[in-house]
Amino acid sequence: MTILLTGGSGKTAGHIANLLKEAKLPFIVGSRSSNPHTVERHRTFDWLDEATFNNVLSVDEGMEPVSVVWLVSPPILDLAPPVIRFIDFASSRGVKRFVLLSASTVEKGGPAMGLIHAHLDTIEGVSYTVLRPSWFMENFSTRGEFPCDTIREEDTIYSAAKDGKIPFISVADIARVALRALTAPALHNKDHVLLGPELLTYDDVAEILTRVVGRNIHHVRLTESELAAKLQERGMPADEAAMHASLDSIVEAGAEEKLNTEVKDLTGEEPRHFADFVSDNKNVWLMRD
């Protein structure tokens, strides 16, 4: 089998690609732009351009056809329709297994990825797995992400989550589960909520960063509307900023305040602690432009 990784320039695909290389499993990567780590396997792919759909299902001579797809939805508000169109296209061309990256609070039939989840459940002859991780630790360490940039530039984390708690999870842990989902039939037609090993408020996050990085990192509590305005100041469109800010209100209400053992149950290893993640990545915040 050959595995297709969509979202090739995103956080998860690079980690999964490295695991597939180590396992010597054939794969290709689809995205609008190539990732330096996967450039030799890259195919141009755009969710909003159906002319590119067949491109990512074409394989090099000697490779088996694409039969498994890692689905990472495009970063647009109305994300379900183009993903569903691609799923239907791919399944009509022999793809038999899909693994969807969703989110911990999104149930089947809910908005956005929940609509894609529900659609996968209707396709005969196709198996699927849905991974529903909580918030990524890497949002704090990826340049261009709001939390990372404000920590680096202002020693500040802005949120509207107040005392809401989040079981932050590392992309490396998500990738290890994804590898199993892409290759292990036993995980099919299920969803898995993937959580980190501890519940942290943004005050806790700021305290850990302060301790490890050696600078005083502050958590500034905003209202939802104030956070949306702050995101717009950083160049985010108004509707997208409002959506992102509303997620913090969901956190404040306790929607993410939960723990489980899914990562260890599926991989045999405990998920990473946030303090260890910060220690391993502290140069991101130590180095300033």
Curated annotation (Swiss-Prot):
Q: Which Gene3D superfamilies match?
A: NAD(P)-binding Rossmann-like Domain (3.40.50.720), UDP-galactose 4-epimerase, domain 1 (3.90.25.10)
Top-level taxonomic group = Eukaryota
* Pathway noted in the entry: Alkaloid biosynthesis; ergot alkaloid biosynthesis
Keyword Oxidoreductase part of the UniProt annotation: yes
The reaction(s) catalysed by this protein are: agroclavine + NADP(+) = didehydroagroclavine + NADPH + H(+)
The biological process GO terms on file are: indole alkaloid biosynthetic process
* Database matches in Pfam families: NmrA
Subunit structure of this entry?
A: Monomer.
- Give the family this protein belongs to, as stated in its UniProt record: Belongs to the fgaFS/easG family.
Protein name (record) = Agroclavine dehydrogenase
Higher taxonomy: Eukaryota, Fungi, Dikarya, Ascomycota, Pezizomycotina
